[in-house]
């Protein structure tokens, strides 16, 4: 007897919260189920939270998502391709279901945490003496002196 392997994407026929079936004009068109859409696929924590049916492979260097380039890719709006100043402070992700409080909290908290992390890293680098661009020769000599200790 032949065995059939079915991926998570093939099992998921809908991604919308209404539970509607695939439209009749597109039979066999499969969509991955997503809790939300991340602003950046480089944000691994967000991708792990949002994409429900991805198999995660633990490689020696890092944990990598397997199967992100699935059989279906939805069209993206021009707003995503050409961001304006109004979208600079966007959320970490956008929830598929606006009533999903856990998702909404994750996306909102993620935005605040990422900006706090950026500010903290900048302050840490300043305290370590790595940012001497505005302080001049005195800063550079202090940095060289700290490196000799």
From Swiss-Prot:
Coiled coil: none annotated. Keywords: Cleavage on pair of basic residues, Disulfide bond, Secreted, Vasoactive, Vasoconstrictor. The record marks 56-57 as: Cleavage. Residues 6-26 are annotated as: Disordered. Endothelins are endothelium-derived vasoconstrictor peptides. Probable ligand for G-protein coupled receptors EDNRA and EDNRB which activates PTK2B, BCAR1, BCAR3 and, GTPases RAP1 and RHOA cascade in glomerular mesangial cells. Also binds the DEAR/FBXW7-AS1 receptor. Promotes mesenteric arterial wall remodeling via activation of ROCK signaling and subsequent colocalization of NFATC3 with F-actin filaments. NFATC3 then translocates to the nucleus where it subsequently promotes the transcription of the smooth muscle hypertrophy and differentiation marker ACTA2. GO terms for molecular function: endothelin A receptor binding; endothelin B receptor binding; hormone activity. GO terms for biological process: endothelin receptor signaling pathway; intracellular calcium ion homeostasis; positive regulation of protein localization to nucleus; regulation of systemic arterial blood pressure by endothelin; regulation of vasoconstriction; vein smooth muscle contraction. It is found in: Secreted. This is Endothelin-1. SMART domains: END. Residues 1-33, 57-149 form a propeptide. The keyword Disulfide bond applies. Disulfide bonds join 36-50, 38-46. Residues 93-107 are annotated as: Endothelin-like. One of its GO terms (cellular component) is extracellular space. Belongs to the endothelin/sarafotoxin family. Its main location: secreted.
């Amino acid at each position: 007897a032949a065995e059939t392997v079915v991926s998570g994407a093939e099992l998921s026929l809908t991604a919308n919260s209404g539970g509607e079936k695939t439209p009749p004009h597109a039979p066999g068109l499969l969509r991955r189920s997503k809790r939300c859409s991340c602003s950046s696929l480089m944000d691994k924590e967000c991708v792990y939270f949002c994409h429900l049916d991805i198999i995660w492979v633990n490689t020696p260097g890092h944990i990598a998502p397997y199967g992100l380039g699935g059989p279906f890719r939805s069209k993206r709006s021009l707003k995503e391709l050409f961001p304006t100043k109004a979208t600079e402070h966007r959320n970490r992700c956008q929830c598929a279901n606006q009533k999903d409080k856990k998702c909404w909290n994750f996306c909102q908290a993620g935005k605040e945490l990422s900006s706090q992390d950026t500010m903290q890293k900048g302050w840490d680098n300043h305290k370590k003496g790595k940012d001497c661009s505005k302080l001049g020769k005195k800063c550079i000599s202090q940095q060289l002196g700290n490196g000799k200790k």
